């Protein structure tokens, strides 16, 4: 089935992180994004959409959590307890693009913000897990907050002085 309105963007993402084994802090050293949204009608708007999608992916992977107790009661008090990255926490994005025209759109355009958001989350997560791969770690639950990463370091015994 090939409906006339089917369009989808795609991208590829690469993330390099440093993990402080004593504090659990994760610093994104480098993040590279290559996106394809078809015809680039307004490059400045596209860049903003990519930055926004990546920033939300960063927030989801690295800190956003809505905690509940065993009875399902929400434990957060306000958005002060919810990670909303500012320009201070947000990494510098290195972006590039390729163009594959969409045959179902008169201009060949596609969506843009979906790819960096959906692809960015596992990219951040895999970068953190990769930092522990030499110790046999193949999975870590998100978000990768400093507390969770510190607990992982502690469980592995790598943060002993």
Identify what each model region corresponds to:
Residues 1-161:
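C-terminal catalytic domains of large/alpha subunits in multi-subunit enzymes
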